């Protein structure tokens, strides 16, 4: 292999011909020149190697695990991305608590052995990690490289001096021993790609290429490219080429390198602008050359677009006033925890884009680089966010552990890594946090990128360029009385909840109806739907219910109303709804804790199934004709004639509704919030309900529901996500329950079993059910949830063949509609040639083993109450699945009636404030109305505290509590510190309730109670307190 040795004399040497004899003689001088030599291979100036495969992992801790020579053959062999917490699953008492969906933390180690050639030793070699959560430490051949506390940042180490010819070993320790370290579910481990980068000693320093577009006109765009070169020496050339996305060269520049920090400008005529509608991209190829030989080459994607913010009119993109139609999205939102591959991540983001969004806020942390690459490509504007808090928010989070020491290093990595992405339109420094460090952070960030403005989600708005407001932006008072002094964006709104397939006609407010909310009336005088996931008699608190899909379950405002407000308010730049996908964690705040383990605020559930809300946004934000109807038309326990609100979301001119072929009239979608859906009140009768959309009088689309009978067969569909970059194909296997006529049975809850074969690995099984305790990774089944479930698979490296056998014992779990049971099994080829597959089913209904006593299944059969059906599936004579399903009147969903509409009334524990221990200015009072007990506590403008005593006869764990309060001090929140058993928990804020006489409201939160005695204290913080009436423990 050809090699070249070049004398290393820095460009900044004052005398390039100076004699070095005076140092220690000519021999030493020659030695110095040799040591400073640059050796490079012209055939491969930059080599990036996929380092994702063949890691050994163990969930234990020992200092010996860092050693170079260690027998790790018994450890688990896996590929990254990897999330051990997700793989372990939900556990009562899980380390991450309710905020983390009861998942665990722990300490884990990864080790990887690789070979290195003699020729590569002359290179500079980096190991790049795109994301490790958290407190990672890295060793190479037993040599410690360093520690990176933050779990949501990329980093790298130069490992050159520790490498050797032959075997080398990387060891990574990941420490999540202190939990909870986030307020939502977080991954644990190496959850993002890893790569090895070999470059010549003279190379572009990481993250130093900075592409700006200082001038963009219709016919000409100027591109400015800055770079920083490590190991520059005399005689080098610097080349820049600009290329279109398909590789056509459109501009070039070449110069002798006169500085280690070259800066050049080129022109593009005319530039194609980047936007969500037309995400036009360009590439800049930068090269360092010695003569004609390329020493280093880097290709960077960029785009042309202009961004402007105006206080009166909001956000402007490419000279057009644009509303930001966005979602907040946790990295972990969706079905795989934090271990996303690029094909799966593209599916996730494209699903959101297809809903009609044009913007996304990764909440509340930066994400791996592939996220921004995809947003560039598909056209999603990104509010790029770095931190949740600038101090402690979760008990053991980054704000507590490392922020003060590490924020500058993390902000530098974040901005210099991401600043070339055209999708990123604003930087966000934090979320619902406050600190004197904010001005310093803004100044530090602007030094790294002067081309973008800074905001935060309700953090130090006075120090930000753009005022970001979270939930407070949903209130009438904010919208109607706001006097802005700077541009505004709603960084987190609206907050609505919805469970796919579940409906209620009565409005649900998370914290009871707050003052200053927009109207959201009930859809019917009385409730007409009475099913639940849990029998209310078994609820642990009043929150353990599902939420309606009618867009009538919220904190302050419906999705429809907030879109109207945003659309029609000129200064309102747009919103980022909470959230796009459902996510694991924060299960206590809204739903009272276990068995709930996830948050249902998304427009898609964690399995990626689209909720009705998804189609509302699609009807408002997309132009391709669409139509969607709700609810379904299968209501087996409903009285005939019960009036059901039927809604249709459509972007048609008008919609006509038919029931059993008879027209029920036409309706036109309106622009006012409660007219955005077409609506009919339809007396229920079995049959077919059909909606037909018209544009200019012509039918453009139609949708229908037919009343389904008991589930009798499976519908299985496969979505293949093509391999991309270093990642293999992924597959989404969707199973649905159908009746014999092929209609979806919308209450399907039977278990679907999966036998995975060949060169694929099961990543997750998910159905969107917030109370399903089944392991998502270790079980071989997942129950249907309202008729649907999914399995997510990833192909192994170099796959050849793969298949899946799916099977289910199908029927009405409660045997209400029918006692007829069907068993269905299917073989589906994923990769390779389809093979003959003979499937045989044997079953029993008397508890006996179907392997030895099973009857050959030929046709559907009847069962009695409280029967367990056991079955096996044999493939070509070999048993591949063992199944069982229990049927009976006490199985499955809870079905109630008008008497069970709210069975929680009268339950729980309420403790009057005046009966607690009062200190300071806190005094009992009766000078108001509608208080509970003998009075309430009035702080009379002073400082003090209330302490309640509670004997917990139940198990220790998370409990939902509410404080009943009242005040009318507009603009004040009267923050009070909450302590439980003398441990600070959080600060509670009390919004004005609208009066001082009888306008009592509740503010909820979650606390941990121990068994036995507990003390709960509220203490003022210098701003006095509201009237406090009682503490209610749900």
Curated annotation (Swiss-Prot):
Query: GO molecular function: any one?
Result: beta-glucuronidase activity
Ranges for the CBM6 domain? 909-1034
| UniProt EC number | 3.2.1.31
Name any GO cellular component annotation. Answer: cytoplasm
Instruction: Provide the top EC class.
Output: hydrolase
**Which subcellular locations apply to this protein?**
Cytoplasm
Q: Which residues form the signal peptide?
A: none
SUPFAM superfamilies cross-referenced by the UniProt entry: (Trans)glycosidases, beta-Galactosidase/glucuronidase domain, Galactose-binding domain-like
| The keyword Cytoplasm is annotated on this UniProt entry | yes
As recorded in UniProt, coiled-coil segments are none
What triggers its expression?
Answer: By ulvan and rhamnose.
Q: Which residues form the active site?
A: 432
User: Which reaction is the catalytic activity of this chain?
Assistant: a beta-D-glucuronoside + H2O = D-glucuronate + an alcohol
PROSITE patterns linked to this entry: CBM6, GLYCOSYL_HYDROL_F2_2
Q: Which UniProt keywords apply?
A: Cytoplasm, Glycosidase, Hydrolase
| Family membership | Belongs to the glycosyl hydrolase 2 family.
| PANTHER family assigned | BETA-GALACTOSIDASE, BETA-MANNOSIDASE
What this chain does, per the entry, is described as: Glycoside hydrolase that may be involved in ulvan degradation. Ulvan is the main polysaccharide component of the Ulvales (green seaweed) cell wall. It is composed of disaccharide building blocks comprising 3-sulfated rhamnose (Rha3S) linked to D-glucuronic acid (GlcA), L-iduronic acid (IduA), or D-xylose (Xyl).
| UniProt-recorded name of the protein | Putative beta-glucuronidase
Q: Which organism is it from?
A: Formosa agariphila (strain DSM 15362 / KCTC 12365 / LMG 23005 / KMM 3901 / M-2Alg 35-1)
